[in-house]
UniProtKB/Swiss-Prot annotation:
Its EC number(s): 5.2.1.8
Annotated localization: Cytoplasm
Organism name: Pseudomonas syringae pv. tomato (strain ATCC BAA-871 / DC3000)
Similarity annotation: Belongs to the FKBP-type PPIase family. Tig subfamily.
Pfam families assigned: FKBP_C (PF00254), Trigger_C (PF05698), Trigger_N (PF05697)
Name listed for the protein in its UniProt record: Trigger factor
């Protein structure tokens, strides 16, 4: 077998492969012999059909099958011989083939980039620490109460946080517009569900009252036909209902499936959940900084095939998450390219760190992570048992643990600053923290 390789770009390879005619004929004959053993042809006993008849009837098909298998086999033999690491399936172009002569074809494909991860000492990480204070716990209990609020009709003027039942009709330039009208819809004042000025304009309204609201759609409104335009809404208030927060009692506690009884038992369980959330938030923020640092210190070119595969995965995830009748390939690739590029780059860099430092998933950390995840459920023992019976889930946990070990390896070499903050700041999402 003859092989030559041309580097057509940083990652693309054009490999020309020649397969000797003798090897082709051997494969063709092997298939014809297999066919002869089971072929049923009128006038001949099974297994006794002359090879000339078999060849006349089946040679073309056997040759096509043999060529396909040989191209696949010789391609992988060639990449092993040339010490190449393909990042995707090759595009195959036959150059010449005649019966009885050598086969020559060209395989064009991308390879994984070869690089060494460096720049660990240029990575700066701010590692937060925090505790769950009693005041944080009190605030969380209020959040839980508000999440379970119920509303009772009140005979008074509407205030912020009241729930109104309203009918409304909106007009732009004196014309009713699509989606601008509704009847008997519920609206909590101050929720920010409606465009600016709408909810504020209903503060002080009473049941049975009609109000005319003059508002303006935001410039970045999702409906471009309405963005930036003035509108007039005629609103009729059907009912005004005031919020009633539930009492912290056994009935309330049961909604959360907490076995402990009494307010102190409930507070203890909520605190455990908050502490678990705190640990995860701090760990996630450290990981994000490490990954950002690795990307900045190690710019690499990534194979287009990997990017396309990741874009397609993200498309499928988007359809599964948001539903609808749209097909994944109908979503524009541009929506996912930036995220896909980051994922692919990080995947390659993390894999290289694992290789450079010969990292293996730590069994003790795997057990610890499973216990941590199981502790969030009512029957943690059953959850732990389920993980250990499910090899796919176990492999996913091992992957997460290995990624954490990569983070730990980087932290040993990076510049790390510890900072004590409040619980609220520690669990605040990264984007929200940047906005502040």
């Amino acid at each position: 077998m003859q092989v030559s390789v041309e580097n057509t770009s940083a990652l693309e390879r054009r490999m020309t492969i020649g397969v000797p005619a003798e090897r082709i004929e051997t494969e063709v004959n092997k298939r014809l012999q297999q066919t002869a053993r089971k072929a049923k042809i009128p006038g001949f006993r099974p297994g006794k059909v002359p090879m000339s008849v078999i060849r006349q009837r089946y040679e073309d098909g056997a040759r096509q099958e043999a060529l396909g298998d040989l191209i696949q086999a010789t391609f992988y033999e060639a990449v092993v011989e040339q010490k190449l690491n393909p990042a995707g399936a090759p595009a195959v172009e036959p150059k010449s083939f005649e019966k009885g002569k050598d086969l020559e074809y060209v395989a064009t494909f991308e390879v994984f980039p070869e690089f060494t991860v460096a720049g660990f000492d240029t990575i700066a990480v701010e590692r937060l620490s925090a505790d769950v204070a009693d005041s944080d716990l009190d605030n969380m209990l209020e959040v839980l109460r508000k999440q379970n609020v119920r509303f009772e009709v009140a005979d008074r003027a509407a205030q912020n946080e009241d729930q109104l039942n309203i009918d409304f009709e909106g007009k732009v330039d004196g014309e009713v517009f699509a989606g601008g009208s509704a009847t008997a819809t519920q609206l909590v004042l101050g929720s920010g569900r409606m465009i600016p000025g709408f909810e504020d304009g209903l503060v002080g309204a009473k049941a049975g009252e009609e109000r005319v609201l003059n508002v303006t759609f935001p410039e970045d409104y999702q409906n471009l036909d309405l963005a930036g335009k003035a509108a007039e809404f005629t609103v009729t208030v059907n009912t005004v209902s005031e919020p009633k927060l539930p009492e912290l009692n056994e009935e309330f506690f049961k909604q959360f499936g907490i076995k402990e009884t009494g307010i102190e038992g409930f507070r203890t369980e909520v605190r455990k959940n908050m502490e678990r959330e705190l640990r995860q938030a701090i760990k996630s923020k450290v990981k994000n900084q490490v990954m950002d640092g690795l990307l900045a210190a190690n710019p690499i070119e990534v194979p287009k095939a990997l990017l396309e595969n990741e874009v397609n995965r993200l498309r499928v995830q988007a359809v599964q998450q948001f539903g609808g009748n749209i097909k994944p390939d109908q979503l524009p690739a541009e929506l996912f390219e930036e995220q896909a590029k980051r994922r692919v780059e990080l995947g390659l860099i993390v894999a290289e760190v694992v290789k450079q430092f010969d990292l293996k998933p730590d069994d003790a950390r795997v057990r610890e992570m499973i216990q941590e995840m199981a502790s969030a459920y009512q029957e943690p023992e059953q959850v732990v048992a389920w993980y250990y019976k499910n090899e796919q889930q176990m492999n996913e946990v091992r992957s997460v643990v290995l990624e954490e070990q990569v983070v730990d390896t980087v932290l040993q070499k990076a510049s790390v600053t510890d900072k004590s903050v409040s619980y609220e700041e520690a669990v605040k999402p990264v984007e929200a923290a940047k906005a502040d």
